[in-house]
Structure formats: structure tokens, C-alpha cells
Amino acid sequence: MSVLTRYGTVIYGRTLEGYAANMLRSVILAAARSSRIERLIGTAPVSRSLVRRYVAGEATADAVAAVRTLAADGLLATLYYLGEDTVAVEQAHATRDEYLRLLAALDEEHLARTTEVSVKLSALGQRLDAELAHDLAREICAAAADSGTTVTVDMEDHTVTDSTLEIVARLREDFPSVGAVLQAYLRRTEDDCRSLAGPGSRIRLCKGAYREPESVAYQRRLDIDRSYVRCVNALMAGEGYPMLATHDPRLIEIAVDRARWFDREPDDFEFQMLFGIRPTEQLRLAAEGYRMRVYVPYGDQWYGYLMRRMAERPANAAVFTRSLWSRS
């Protein structure tokens, strides 16, 4: 149950974190980095069906088709080409090239006005050379602007937070609509929300899905939820455009209340949800007049993304476990 006040929100809920659920989440996030488990999962009979639930497809045409369907239902979209932790310059260039093809396709199909793209800097070589990642991201931003849309730069683990925000700041000098992502489970994020929610800013707030040490990130679900609400307040009080990424009914209800309190109209912020998760709720929010954007991943590098989705929803892991024992 949540209790709303005029100056903030206090959440009363499960006071005891499920120890088993936390342990399972840690195991899943560790497995997300394991190439051996990736090979095992890739051969499981159920893998492809679960992948299709969360991933639009492997090709550019699949991504465009998914966006077309969402647009027909009154939903906005952000497209993400799966891939991260690039280890070669050529791979970073290939990722850039795919985004350029994607943006050209969106423009040709007249879908760019309702669709932005999300980019991970590590897929553009951030860990090899931050300047390379900036330059390639800049090319993507320029192509997006030419197509009539924009870019949101995804956030990854805490080791690249400062580098990512620095690159976003540089990109915004020429492309002011470029968005950033902040993760509520990081202890620093409430301050980041206050400092970054200036005029023209676009901030996507999510809970966070990477494995982080307690020194930098809240570990209990209750603490993460409370941080999320404090961050919502900071963004709603700011002068930017909040993009609230959550599937949690409590947090959606709180966000609607906070928007009213800060005199924000339904088109002055948006909700975001992942492709394949709570589609009925996505349609409900859009029908009620809220801007509802769906995060749509595509491509063949789905393993790490899917494992983080399972970590967020550990019940999904049971389906995979059963499939591994029943492989033919």
C-alpha cells in the first residue's frame, strides 16, 4: 500500500525482501555474463518462443513492422538494436551502420515522428575509446534529426555512468533533444535527477537491471522503490520532460498523482514499458490520454537483454530451467 503526501511519497509494502528472490536475481545476472550458459540457453527448445515475447525480431524490417503495429494502437516506440560491450572498432562501426539503416527505414515508412531510437554507448565502443563512442553516437543523432526524430542514450552499469552523462552533455550541445537514462537503484541518482532536469532535458527513469555492489546501489526492492519515487518528484519538479519507465502499478499510480501535483499535463511526460510486458496496461494508459512509449529491442544479440528481463521477473527463470531439462 502507498501513502501519498503533499511533499513526497512514502511506500509501505513488503518490509522483508525475499531472500530467495534476491539470490535468484544475483545468479541470473551473473549468468548474463557467461558465454557457456549463453550457448546452453541458445539451444533450449523454449528459448525462441521466449525471445519472441520480448524481442521484435532480428532484422530491420522486423523492427519497423513492430513499430507500425504499435503506432496503429496509439503507442509510441523507442527502438534498440541489441548489442553491448563491443570489443572491436569494426563492430562499433557495424552498430552505427545498422542505426543509420533503421532511421532511414523509419523515415521512409513515415514512422519517425512516433519512434525514437535508444543507443548503448558500449555497443559503439565506449570501453575501447570514449571519443569513438561519442563520434559514432553523433552520427546517429544527426541521422535521427534528419529523419525528424531523436535519440535516447541508454545507461549501463555504474562504471560508465559519468562517461555516459559526459557524452550526452556533449551531444546535447548540437542535438538538444537527446535523452539520458538514470537508474533509481543507484544511490547517486536522486542528485542526478535534480541536476539534469533542466529546460529541454529528456530523462528516462528506470529502476536498473545490472548487478551492482551495495556501496553504489540499493539492494532491497523497497529501498529501490522509495528511491524511484524521490526521483519522480525531482523530475516532475524540474523543467525537463520525464520519461518514466516502470511496469509497477503502484509506481504508475504515484507518478500520475505527482504529475497532477506538479501541474503537468498528460502530454508533458510519458510512461515507458518494455515490448512484451503488460501490453494491456500499455493500451489502457494510451487510451486514458497518456503518452505511452514501448521499448522495442531487435537483433540477434538477445541473450544479455533477456537474462536481465528474467532477473527483473524471476518467475520467468523457471520456464527456462524446465526447458533445459527437457531438451531434445
Model-derived features with residue positions:
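Positively charged, amphipathic and often flexible ligand-engagement surfaces
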Residues: 4-328
